[in-house]
Amino acid sequence: MAENIMVDSHVWVEDPERAWIDGVVLNIKGEEAEIKTNDGRDVIANLSRLYPKDTEAPSEGVEDMTRLSYLHEPAVLDNLATRYELNEIYTYTGNILIAVNPFQGLPHLYDAEVMEKYKEAYFKELNPHVFAIGGIAYREMINEGRNKCILVSGESGSGKTETTKMLMRYLAYFGGHTAVEGRTVENQVLESNPVLEAFGNAKTVKNNNSSRFGKFVEIQFDDVGRISGAAIRTYLLERSRVCQVSDPERNYHCFYLLCAAPPEDVERFKLGDPKSFRYLNQSSCYKLDGVNDAEEYLATRRAMDVVGISEKEQDAIFRVVASILHLGNIEFSKGEDADSSSVKDEQSMFHLQMTSELLMCDPHSLEDALCKRMMVTPEEVIKRSLDPLGAAVSRDGLAKTIYSRLFDWLVNKINISIGQDSHSRRLIGVLDIYGFESFKTNSFEQFCINYTNEKLQQHFNQHVFKMEQGEYQKEEIDWSYVEFVDNKDVVDLIEKKPGGIIALLDEACMLPKSTPETFSEKLYHTFKDHKRFMKPKLTRSDFTLVHYAGDVQYQSDQFLDKNKDYVVAEHQDLLNASKCSFVSGLFPPLPKESSKSKFSSIGARFKLQLQQLMETLNSTEPHYIRCVKPNNLLQPTVFDNANVLHQLRSGGVLEAIRVKCAGYPTNRTFIEFLNRFLILAPEILKGEYEAEVACKWILEKKGLTGYQIGKSKVFLRAGQMAELDAHRTRVLGESARMIQGQVRTRLTRERFVLMRRASVNIQANWRGNIARKISKEMRREEAAIKIQKNLRRQIAKKDYGKTKSSALTLQSGVRTMAARHEFRYKLTTRAATVIQAYWRGYSAISDYKKLKRVSLLCKSNLRGRIARKQLGQSKQADRKEETEKERKVELSNRAEEAVDMSFVLHSEQSDDAESGHGRKAKLSIESEDGLDKSSVLHSEQSDDEELGHERKTKLSIESEDGHSDQSDDEEIEHERKTKHCIQAEDGIEKSYVMHSDQSDDEEIGHKRKTKHSIQAEDGIEKSFVVHSDQSDDEEIGHERKTKHAIQVEDGIQKSFVTCSEKPYNTFSVVSQITSPIRDTEIESLTAEVEMLKALLQVEKQRADISERKCAEARELGERRRKRLEETERRVYQLQDSLNRLLYSMSDQFSQLKSILRSPSMSASTMASAPVVRDDLADSSENSEASSSDSDFTFPAPSPSSDNFSTFNPNQLQVIVQDLSTTEAKGTESYDSDKEGGFEDYF
């Protein structure tokens, strides 16, 4: 291109930072040129390294880079950058789609409307899109019956996973069911993505959602194009990430989702913050920007429901995940024996217990499986202990094994739930596999990943380069050979058998004494002359491979351990014996012949899986999507030219562009071509032509040039197939239009007849419309007259309004002056109202003091009377008690004698005694009932007094707090407070009298300790304080009952006189009596004696009860005494509040005095209202007190009744009488103009 470059030419020149930069040639000297770049720098470069720039290229770039005028690296790079700035992230390169990761959401590119648009369009008819690739693959599968596959490739973080999900979503939309049928296959296929992402994706340095496994989704379709089944294959899960995480990467997403689960799940699994788990806190990254782990956890559970994983299985899955976290927190220390280990501390023991509980296995068996190994020899089985380091390695190995088995179970469960269609003959495969990786530390996982990418690149080379060019040679067509870089040598270096790296690794794993150093030495010796293998300096175990994408240095320290595909026997036996069927299912018993089988390795198994994948890809027709990562910062709108150019070179995109432009991207066999495009030349059907001639006829008829006719195929240039499809669509459209024309003719004739029939009706309607228009004009004219009339009236009304407004303004001024005068008069009225209030307060206080003196005198007299009466009653009770005791002793003695002599009693005396005894019992019962009623009445009265006392005290406090109301309501509040105060003091005095009387009665009752009669008398005395009249009646009744009981006893005693005087003569008298004594009389007397004894016992019991009640009454008196003291304290507070109120009134009298002396007041009124303040109040003990809501501060006087002695009631009455006549008038005028009056006042 150097001959096309001259001075002032626009060229692309290499730049160390931006890869390529445009500029203008200033001067050319020999083979070098001086260029002025667009950033102002002068650069000198060789002409062979300069590329011309297309200055006429579209500003928005081109959709297919095969249409670029200059096809070279800087042009391709500039076109991608231009479209990326416009958010056009998709660009074609022939049939290859290049997708640049936007690192931001672009929902407008993937909604249902866009999918519908691409569903109806042909390939390249619309803008480049991932949906277009899915659409062409689907149409070719349906139309041609060929199986298709779409290979999504690119570096880590280039957007392969998201692109794959969009493809699957579009294919599900294209081949989905029209109606909702529950969990359809397409829904299950789509919802399998979030499940596998949760357990197989993790954050890496280059990507926040990097797939740590390979995935090939095979979507099956039925004969009508609907999805009928699917299968998912996974490759090489990165097991080491479970135990080892580099900063700032993260472990698998599922661990963080489970830590953010709902509280009930976290509590059930005993989880917490991710920082508390060793497998997660190795990195400082716990959160992802824009990702809510709690919401993602619920979304994953919903996706599991759709896929077909039951609730029980979901719980088991997350229980296993939680057990891995607890397993990682188990630490070991040295045991008692040498080279042995044990659980380190209590915390580690807790995590061991939780792990065994979650896995449902024995904790001691788990500890033995981690800390010991069984060695089987021909002679015996030896149990060997592991040191702490060996136990930690065993722990990590168990965690990796459990997670790997869990992931395999998930994939298998998804495949079983979705199901495969064994009768399907059409399928589309979508491959999403890890991209090329090169980190600071590259281990066995990176080796396998890059090996996979080498195989895919080889497949890409074979398809795009070898297969294309080989096809050209086979068909013997003219073409220009394109050189390309082949990576077959590096693939052979890795997989060739024998002698490849994988073969040597398997060989080293089978040797018991192999080490990473011996394995590396073997590699150095075997591949020392290989151009793709290099030995780094200063290392003994590292080696470097020259991949198609760049050089990668691998550390082989863990290659041997990671390549071994086996499970520790102790771990297998432990988990196979788990009580959880899910866990035991992950570790089924091994077949007996497995121990005798050949050695198996991860590398060999992965190589076999990869070969099967290549066979599947080779059996289908591929479509390629190359994903490109624009920058390593993972930020939107940042396009790193050097990074993108490296990906384009390593991905073979530039070479593919050259091949596609120089070659023929589309080819079809003659039969396929004629079956599809024969309708473009129908005359061929009339003759017998060979297939080759017929194909050439069609192409020449449509004016296509540049095509090639091979031996069995037609080779078309880029875009010619789309042109032929457009002609075919046009022919089909013309045929359809002819058919539609005949139908439309018939429909048009029918429509004409209807229109002619309708025209008559239209004309009639039109004439009616004209008449209506004339009528409308007439109505409009009439309306115009009305409008004019209303307008004139409005003008006149406006003039009238102005005149009225002027009059109102004048009247307002006059009324304002009158209102001011009226307001001044209202101030005078208000002052008089305040004076009246204070006068009423003074009168109330005077009345209160008089009532208080009278009440004290009455109380004193009442207490004296009660005390004298109680003294007399006490003496009388003592005398009665002594008499009662003597009579009861004598009665008891006579009753005993009467028992011996009872058979001589006459029937008449027995009847009288029985009647007397009944009356006595009746009187005793009535006396007891009276005593109980008296006690209950006294108790109720005491409770009422207590409630009244509390209510009065509360009213006193409320009256004290209410003193701070506004000045307009002070006179009402003052009257209420005075009334409450008087009521409170009366209640206090009454309560005091009650408590005093009760205390005296309790002391008398305690000294006497009387039985039934004295207890009743004491109850009567207690109730006398509240109900004096009732008490007198009850006392008289009690005395009458007592007298009657004594008479009954005397009657009984008289009946026993004869027997008591001569006891020994009684027997002789009885013997002389000739009349027999009836047995009934003896039984009657005996019963009467027993009844008397029972009565005596009852009386004793009642005496005990009376003594107990006396003690209770004493306690009640003590409690009431305390309440009385509290009441007295509240009374003192109330008196203090009242004194403050009185002093506030005196201060406001002084202020009223100053107001009444103002010039606006009447002279006669002011002269008759002097208010004098007591000077002695200023020297009181209370210095100052202020109301809570008042604007005044005043000193508080001492609580004496002389504070208002200086007020002259006659003078206050003069003021009240003068103003009372005008009070009504002032009130009415105040309501008429309140606002203006206050403005003048202030």
Swiss-Prot record:
<keyword id="KW-0518">Myosin</keyword>
<feature type="region of interest" description="6 X 33 AA repeats of Q-S-D-D-x-E-E-x(2)-H-x-R-K-x-K-x(2)-I-x(2)-E-D-G-x(3)-S-x-V-x-H-S-x">
    <location>
        <begin position="876"/>
        <end position="1061"/>
    </location>
</feature>
<keyword id="KW-0547">Nucleotide-binding</keyword>
<feature type="region of interest" description="Disordered">
    <location>
        <begin position="908"/>
        <end position="1042"/>
    </location>
</feature>
<feature type="domain" description="IQ 4">
    <location>
        <begin position="803"/>
        <end position="832"/>
    </location>
</feature>
<keyword id="KW-0175">Coiled coil</keyword>
<feature type="repeat" description="5">
    <location>
        <begin position="998"/>
        <end position="1029"/>
    </location>
</feature>
<feature type="compositionally biased region" description="Polar residues">
    <location>
        <begin position="1199"/>
        <end position="1224"/>
    </location>
</feature>
<dbReference type="GO" id="GO:0005516">
    <property type="term" value="F:calmodulin binding"/>
</dbReference>
<dbReference type="GO" id="GO:0030048">
    <property type="term" value="P:actin filament-based movement"/>
</dbReference>
<feature type="compositionally biased region" description="Basic and acidic residues">
    <location>
        <begin position="948"/>
        <end position="966"/>
    </location>
</feature>
<dbReference type="GO" id="GO:0016787">
    <property type="term" value="F:hydrolase activity"/>
</dbReference>
<dbReference type="GO" id="GO:0003774">
    <property type="term" value="F:cytoskeletal motor activity"/>
</dbReference>
<feature type="domain" description="IQ 2">
    <location>
        <begin position="755"/>
        <end position="784"/>
    </location>
</feature>
<feature type="domain" description="Myosin N-terminal SH3-like">
    <location>
        <begin position="6"/>
        <end position="55"/>
    </location>
</feature>
<feature type="binding site">
    <location>
        <begin position="207"/>
        <end position="215"/>
    </location>
    <ligand>
        <name>ATP</name>
    </ligand>
</feature>
<dbReference type="Pfam" id="PF00612">
    <property type="entry name" value="IQ"/>
</dbReference>
<feature type="repeat" description="2">
    <location>
        <begin position="909"/>
        <end position="940"/>
    </location>
</feature>
<feature type="region of interest" description="Actin-binding">
    <location>
        <begin position="587"/>
        <end position="610"/>
    </location>
</feature>
<dbReference type="GO" id="GO:0016459">
    <property type="term" value="C:myosin complex"/>
</dbReference>
<feature type="domain" description="IQ 5">
    <location>
        <begin position="828"/>
        <end position="857"/>
    </location>
</feature>
<feature type="region of interest" description="Actin-binding">
    <location>
        <begin position="610"/>
        <end position="632"/>
    </location>
</feature>
<feature type="compositionally biased region" description="Basic and acidic residues">
    <location>
        <begin position="1225"/>
        <end position="1242"/>
    </location>
</feature>
<feature type="repeat" description="3">
    <location>
        <begin position="941"/>
        <end position="965"/>
    </location>
</feature>
<feature type="region of interest" description="Disordered">
    <location>
        <begin position="1175"/>
        <end position="1242"/>
    </location>
</feature>
<keyword id="KW-0067">ATP-binding</keyword>
<feature type="domain" description="IQ 6">
    <location>
        <begin position="851"/>
        <end position="880"/>
    </location>
</feature>
<dbReference type="GO" id="GO:0005524">
    <property type="term" value="F:ATP binding"/>
</dbReference>
<protein>
    <recommendedName>
        <fullName>Myosin-16</fullName>
    </recommendedName>
</protein>
<dbReference type="Pfam" id="PF00063">
    <property type="entry name" value="Myosin_head"/>
</dbReference>
<dbReference type="InterPro" id="IPR000048">
    <property type="entry name" value="IQ_motif_EF-hand-BS"/>
</dbReference>
<feature type="repeat" description="4">
    <location>
        <begin position="966"/>
        <end position="997"/>
    </location>
</feature>
<comment type="function">
    <text>Myosin heavy chain that is required for the cell cycle-regulated transport of various organelles and proteins for their segregation. Functions by binding with its tail domain to receptor proteins on organelles and exerting force with its N-terminal motor domain against actin filaments, thereby transporting its cargo along polarized actin cables.</text>
</comment>
<dbReference type="InterPro" id="IPR001609">
    <property type="entry name" value="Myosin_head_motor_dom-like"/>
</dbReference>
<keyword id="KW-0009">Actin-binding</keyword>
<feature type="region of interest" description="Actin-binding">
    <location>
        <begin position="493"/>
        <end position="527"/>
    </location>
</feature>
<feature type="compositionally biased region" description="Low complexity">
    <location>
        <begin position="1179"/>
        <end position="1191"/>
    </location>
</feature>
<keyword id="KW-0677">Repeat</keyword>
<feature type="region of interest" description="Disordered">
    <location>
        <begin position="869"/>
        <end position="893"/>
    </location>
</feature>
<keyword id="KW-0505">Motor protein</keyword>
<comment type="similarity">
    <text>Belongs to the TRAFAC class myosin-kinesin ATPase superfamily. Myosin family. Plant myosin class XI subfamily.</text>
</comment>
<feature type="domain" description="IQ 3">
    <location>
        <begin position="780"/>
        <end position="809"/>
    </location>
</feature>
